Structures are given as C-alpha cells and as structure tokens.
Curated annotation (Swiss-Prot):
InterPro entries: UPF0212. This is UPF0212 protein MA_1372. It comes from the Archaea. Pfam families: DUF555. PANTHER family: UPF0212 PROTEIN MJ0068, UPF0212 PROTEIN TK1194. Belongs to the UPF0212 family.
Length: 129
C-alpha cells in the first residue's frame, strides 16, 4: 500500500463582493466552515492561474456584477491507497461529502514516504472514515 498527497480544485461562487480579497476571504471561510471540524486535516487555499500573456501566476478570482468565482485548492494526504487512482477516489469522496454540489477536479497526485510522525498516524485514521 502506498501513501499519496492529493490536490483537488473547485470553483466557489461568492455573491455580493466588491474586491478580489473579499471574495477570497469569504470563499475560504465558507469552505472551511463546511469542512471543519470533521476534516481538519484538509488544507484549503486559493488556486493560481497563469497569465496567458506573460505567464506570471495570479490568484484564481474573477469578479463580475459583484459576484466572484474563486478557484480553491483542497489538499489532503491519503494513506494506504492501492494506486494513485484509488487515492483520487478516496480524496474526492472524503472532501465531496462535506462540499455537496461543488464539483471537484483532481489537479495533482504525488506519492510520498510515510514519516512515522504521530500527526500522520492521526490523519490515517481520519482519512479512512
């Protein structure tokens, strides 16, 4: 069995905002409320998009008519998965249960070696629920 770090992406809709910073704050707060306290091992962050002209990365936020679409990234470790595809399914299932009606897309799956830390042991138990 292998261990994987899975990164998922979701588009989060935020209404009645005027700035990108407000949209980011509201999106992360709303996602965090839906995930915590059950899934405190899932990391939430804003995704980045590359500028088509210069290639520089910037925050994945688009605002029109005081409504924002924020690209959020969800990261979690999956322990004892049979394959990368199995780890993807586990991560989508665990995170998707809390984020109903929010489509999730797999961005990256990387294998890692278990370090044997106490925190990793706790995450293993939570990831399998």
């Amino acid at each position: 069995m292998k261990n994987f770090h899975v990164v998922l992406e979701a588009a989060w809709l935020v209404r009645d905002v005027k700035t990108a910073d407000d949209a980011i704050g509201v999106a992360i707060s709303e996602a965090g409320k839906r995930l915590n306290p059950k899934l405190d091992f899932v990391e939430v962050d804003v995704g980045s998009t590359s500028c088509p002209a210069c290639g520089e990365p910037f925050s994945s936020v688009f605002i029109a008519a005081n409504t924002a679409l924020v690209g959020l990234i969800f990261e979690m470790k999956v322990f004892d998965a049979e394959s990368a595809e199995h780890a993807e399914r586990i991560a989508k299932s665990v995170i998707g249960k809390s984020l109903r009606d929010i489509p999730l897309t797999v961005v990256e799956v990387t294998e890692f070696e278990r370090s044997g830390e106490k925190g990793d042991q706790q995450q293993k138990g939570k990831a399998k629920k």
